[in-house]
From Swiss-Prot:
PROSITE patterns, A to Z: G_PROTEIN_RECEP_F1_1 (PS00237), G_PROTEIN_RECEP_F1_2 (PS50262)
Coiled coil ranges: none
CDD domains with a match to the protein in the record: 7tmA_mAChR_M1
Positions of glycan attachment: N2, N12
Lineage: Eukaryota, Metazoa, Chordata, Craniata, Vertebrata
Biased composition (Low complexity): 238-257
Topological domain ranges for the Cytoplasmic compartment: 49-62, 122-142, 210-366, 421-460
UniProt keyword annotation of Transmembrane present: yes
Complexes and interactors: Interacts with GPRASP2. Interacts with TMEM147.
Compartmental location: Cell membrane; Postsynaptic cell membrane
Similarity remark: Belongs to the G-protein coupled receptor 1 family. Muscarinic acetylcholine receptor subfamily. CHRM1 sub-subfamily.
Name this protein carries in UniProt: Muscarinic acetylcholine receptor M1
Known function: The muscarinic acetylcholine receptor mediates various cellular responses, including inhibition of adenylate cyclase, breakdown of phosphoinositides and modulation of potassium channels through the action of G proteins. Primary transducing effect is Pi turnover.
Phosphoserine: residues bearing it: S254, S451, S457
Organism: Mus musculus
Length: 460
């Protein structure tokens, strides 16, 4: 949130001179107009993508959706009104429009900061408390937190901006100017800058550091776990074939149909290639799991009937409808079974941990991009706020204008961060821009043997 008034709206700084050259006016108007258009277009793409692509409807993306709403408000109203104010050199829309613009601008800006805090805390608890927090992490609870973030932003700024003049008994804002009346004192501006920018940034950076450390610890634990499963690594992947189970004492091979999974109730498992999962975005991966560490079906794409071991003769052939089993010997030259299931369990545990780690890294990458963009675009202006508290005339007017506009540019950059760090957003943006998205038609395209991927048909 912009915690001070811009140069043209500050009582301590003269407004933009009406005599600016036509080329300067044209350059400023075209540049800011393009930025506003890019901001509106990018954030509308986020909203439409969330609507048409069900894979994006994850809890984490609900926070991004709220952030996009705040950025859309800034791109639609704040950018254009501020540009008009700068180019005209005075506020010509009246006091009511001035107060409404400031209230909308500050509420949306503060909501952006609150949503960034929510995203940071959500990532932090998801990584540090995966079991207890994920059980409570529902869309309804996320919507409640988002609603509270907007409510707090509204309560903090809207009443004070709209009704301060009535509380003190007079309006002290100079004629032809538009700024927040109670922020005309530098010490108050300094306090709001500390509370609205520096404190949230400190909290977000601390949380991100904790997330980074926890993710690194998990990576080391996973490496140690994978290093201890030498029996499981020699047999290759177990995601595309069924093993026969030998007897407990190394007896001859069991007949077809008597495998280690025949004792379980029959069910159809959907196979997902592990390499393919690594290529999926964080949102789609999260939709494949119901809890922390739970891996989607990754064993076999077969339906095994229940077989009675006593009723089945050793020489009886399996029915035609039953799939053939593929025996894959271990290093010792015999099928995995009995004691061999223990390394297989470690292999599956390592795969689940790897899946969870990849997902968390993708989410952390999105968070880091958004946080970095926020710091880079908001820090210059808030540094100038601190400087002006102790030296009113030390900051040139042009720097004030650039710094204030740079805060708005953050709303332009955020959708780019989503696209760069999230494959689902990137692909959906591309299809929407090329007019190739049709959410009503889907087709199944096997990307690899043993895997099924659902993609939208691409037609305008």
């Amino acid at each position: 949130m912009n915690t001070s008034v811009p140069p043209a709206v500050s009582p301590n700084i003269t407004v933009l001179a009406p005599g600016k050259g036509p080329w300067q006016v044209a350059f400023i108007g075209i540049t800011t107009g393009l930025l506003s258009l890019a901001t509106v277009t990018g954030n509308l793409l986020v909203l439409i993508s969330f609507k048409v692509n069900t894979e994006l409807k994850t809890v984490n993306n609900y926070f991004l959706l709220s952030l996009a709403c705040a950025d859309l408000i800034i791109g639609t109203f704040s950018m254009n009104l501020y540009t008009t104010y700068l180019l005209m050199g005075h506020w010509a829309l009246g006091t009511l429009a001035c107060d409404l613009w400031l209230a909308l601008d500050y509420v949306a800006s503060n909501a952006s900061v609150m949503n960034l805090l929510l995203i940071s805390f959500d990532r932090y608890f998801s990584v540090t408390r995966p079991l207890s927090y994920r059980a409570k992490r529902t869309p309804r609870r996320a919507a409640l937190m988002i609603g509270l973030a907007w409510l707090v932003s509204f309560v903090l700024w809207a009443p004070a901006i709209l009704f301060w003049q009535y509380l003190v008994g007079e309006r002290t804002v100079l004629a032809g100017q538009c700024y927040i009346q109670f922020l005309s004192q530098p010490i108050i501006t300094f306090g709001t800058a500390m509370a609205a920018f520096y404190l949230p940034v400190t909290v977000m950076c601390t949380l991100y550091w904790r997330i980074y450390r926890e993710t690194e610890n998990r990576a080391r634990e996973l490496a140690a776990l994978q290093g201890s499963e030498t029996p499981g690594k020699g047999g290759g992947s177990s995601s595309s074939s069924e093993r026969s189970q030998p007897g407990a004492e190394g007896s001859p091979e069991s007949p077809p149909g008597r495998c280690c999974r025949c004792c379980r109730a029959p069910r159809l498992l959907q196979a997902y290639s592990w390499k393919e999962e690594e290529e999926e975005d964080e949102g789609s991966m999260e939709s494949l799991t119901s809890s922390e560490g739970e891996e989607p079906g990754s064993e076999v794409v077969i339906k095994m009937p229940m077989v009675d071991p006593e009723a089945q003769a050793p020489t009886k052939q399996p029915p035609k409808s039953s799939p053939n089993t593929v025996k894959r010997p271990t290093k010792k030259g015999r099928d995995r079974g009995g004691k061999g299931q223990k390394p297989r369990g470690k292999e599956q545990l390592a795969k689940r941990k790897t899946f969870s780690l990849v997902k968390e890294k993708k989410a952390a990458r999105t968070l880091s991009a958004i946080l970095l963009a926020f710091i880079l675009t908001w820090t210059p202006y808030n540094i100038m706020v601190l400087v002006s508290t102790f030296c009113k005339d030390c900051v040139p007017e042009t720097l004030w204008e650039l710094g204030y506009w740079l805060c708005y540019v953050n709303s332009t950059v955020n959708p780019m961060c989503y696209a760069l760090c999230n494959k689902a957003f990137r692909d959906t943006f591309r299809l929407l821009l090329l007019c190739r998205w049709d959410k009503r038609r889907w087709r199944k395209i096997p990307k690899r043997p043993g895997s099924v991927h659902r993609t939208p048909s691409r037609q305008c």
